[in-house]
A protein has these predicted regions:
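Generic hydrophobic alpha-helical membrane-segment signal
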Residues: 19, 52, 57-60, 64, ...
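Membrane-embedded catalytic scaffold of the fatty acid hydroxylase/desaturase
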Residues: 70-153, 157-222
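Hydrophobic core of alpha-helical transmembrane segments in multi-pass integral membrane proteins
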Residues: 28-47, 125-140
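N-terminal signal-anchor transmembrane alpha helix
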Residues: 59-75
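Helix-coil boundary and interhelical linker segments in multi-pass alpha-helical membrane proteins
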Residues: 43-59, 138-151
Length: 222
């Protein structure tokens, strides 16, 4: 299957962005591997530390998953699409760059250098682990139990990695292997609709699972 033609404004923005923002030394594959391996190491270490988990402690997984889905939704609907003081970098990278690099008419990468426009910068995972997952985990360790703390960290980082992997796959070509699975077709369609400039500020803010979009009535109905 031939890739659809890229609209000229998108092609022009991509060329300008690559020249200005992507170093010739950048490796999209190494970027993807860093995100994946770092996340998996943290998840693996956290799981290794679990012992004798009670039913109450297992509830941490569900609660953390729902919490992460809400944070994903609010972060995307809020500062990623509306400029907020001190968080303007998120708005610039997401709305002014990501949504111009990829539109509903041109969703796919043209090469591995384009991974930079989808994956969070490597420093983000260090920020997320060091300034969110670990501090909250330490707090839970002292307020609840060791298992709750490690279950929170494993689930939170697992959710982050799921976000990165799914978002990465949405921007593969439609005829790629992941894109052929029915559930991926549905999630990809929702994200493609979100990349329509006429819809992006109002619909389909969940990148992973559209739980909050259903709850808050922001899932786009075709």
């Amino acid at each position: 299957m031939n890739a659809p033609a890229i609209p000229s404004p998108v092609a022009q923005f991509r060329a300008e962005y690559r020249t200005a923002e992507i170093s010739p030394y950048y490796s999209g594959i190494l970027h993807f591997l860093f995100t994946s391996v770092t996340s998996l190491v943290v998840i693996g270490f956290s799981i290794k530390e679990l012992h004798g988990i009670t039913p109450f402690e297992w509830s941490t997984v569900l609660l953390t998953f729902l919490y992460a889905n809400l944070v994903e939704y609010l972060g995307h609907k809020g500062p990623m699409h509306h400029p907020v003081r001190l968080l303007r970098t998120l708005f610039v990278r997401h709305t002014l760059q990501h949504h111009r690099f990829f539109t509903h008419e041109a969703m796919a990468y043209e090469g591995t250098q384009d991974y930079k426009m989808v994956l969070f910068p490597p420093v983000m995972i260090l920020f997320f682990v060091g300034l969110h997952a670990v501090p909250v985990g330490v707090l839970l360790y002292y307020l609840t139990s060791r298992n709750v703390a490690y279950l929170f960290v494993a689930t939170a980082i697992g959710y982050f990695l799921t976000y990165e992997w799914l978002h990465f796959m949405y921007h593969l070509r439609a005829d790629s292997l992941p894109g052929r699975f029915p559930f991926m077709k549905t999630l990809r369609r929702l994200h493609t609709e979100h990349h329509d400039p006429a819809l992006m500020s109002n619909y389909n803010f969940n990148i992973t699972f559209p739980i909050c979009d259903y709850l808050f009535g922001t899932r786009y109905k075709t």
